[in-house]
Amino acid sequence: MNYRDYLQQLIYKIINPLIHGMIKIGITPNFITTTGFILNVVAAGMFVYAGICGGQNDLSILGWAGGVILFAGLFDMMDGRVARLGNMSSKFGALYDSVLDRYSELMTFFGICYYLSVKDYFIYAIIAFVALIGSLMVSYVRARAEGLGIECKVGFMQRPERVVLTSLGALFCGVFKDITAFDPMLILMVPLTIVAVFANITAFARVRHCYKVMTANEKKND
């Protein structure tokens, strides 16, 4: 069992009572998915608001936005769990979840890029945009590969890691907004830079994985 599976099982043990309660009162996976998406839209709006109207409290707003993203990530875990335990899994539900996940990331990174641009952190905004590109490509390569019949889950920087790094970066940027030893914006940018680098590495690693699998399959068919 790798670290991701271990943490997932640990979190499931904690939230399972809540999951069973949701199933009992009739909450559907799609409702949970939609709620998580709305929370990410709220977080994106908070980044935009911090850029326009935040003033001296803008970093505090960033911190709250990070907390909202982290909370929304919990819904991202619960929808699939409710679907499985409640026997409500469906192909449309899987599609709906995947589509709203992509919209959620787009909205979140749009908010971050907007904030950084408005605050004249131009280089930081580019890094955030590169992180967005990598995040989308990780998901796209997997979806395209699975459409070709290839399982493609390799790589480190998957969605849970991206959500945790982005949300905690924003959260702690707000918590330590009054630090004077360095620009507190670095607290957000270090994890975003990690996402930017490793998400794109993961995307290319998945392309390489698909190439190896396809090449091996072609040799078998010869």
UniProtKB/Swiss-Prot annotation:
KW Transmembrane (keyword) present: yes
GO molecular function: metal ion binding; phosphotransferase activity, for other substituted phosphate groups
Gene Ontology terms: cellular component: membrane
Top-level taxon in the UniProt lineage: Bacteria
Positions bound to a CDP-1,2-diacyl-sn-glycerol: G80, R84, S90
EC annotation from Swiss-Prot or TrEMBL: 2.7.8.-
Reported phenotype of the disruption mutant: Inositol phosphoceramide (IPC) and phosphatidylinositol (PI) is absent and ceramide levels are increased. Results in a mild growth defect. Does not appear to affect production of outer membrane vesicles (OMVs) or OMV cargo selection.
Binding-site positions, Mg(2+) 2: D76, D97, D101
Residues that bind Mg(2+) 1: D76, D79, D97
Chief site of localization: membrane
Name the UniProt record assigns to this protein: Phosphatidylinositol phosphate synthase
Organism field: Bacteroides thetaiotaomicron (strain ATCC 29148 / DSM 2079 / JCM 5827 / CCUG 10774 / NCTC 10582 / VPI-5482 / E50)
